[in-house]
Amino acid sequence: MYTINDLYDLTHTLAGGYLARFTYPWEALSDLADCIRALGAQLDSEYLPFGPEVWVHRTAHVAPTASITGPCIIGPEAEVRHGAFIRGSALVGAHCVVGNSVELKNVILFDNVQTPHYNYVGDSILGYKAHMGAGSITSNVKSDKTHV
């Protein structure tokens, strides 16, 4: 079974230290909100408050029609486009694209991740430079409704 160290280069996310505490990716998801809150409290002045428990880097662009619920961190040069819906517990890395009508929940997007068109990314960790094709979905629900 692949471990976090097999799958990810932890130098490409603010959550590298947090993820290093775990063996498997799914182990990190249950406490992600607390991780983001702790990271948010340590961010430098380049990150600006954008709402309750939401921090956005000053070089990031967030469309006025995007909806963001905390805890959430949006990294440098990231782009959150029209109609994006971030439901909380989301860490969006540097140079990421959260596209139109994309929904994020309980996720870590490493730097340079692209979720550009009509994606649902929930309970997931996407590694450095990952790209989600249009209309793709990740979730923690199996079609037979049993636990993942």
Located regions from the model:
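Flexible, glycine/small-residue-enriched loop-and-beta-strand segment within the central core
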Residues: 40, 66-75, 80-148
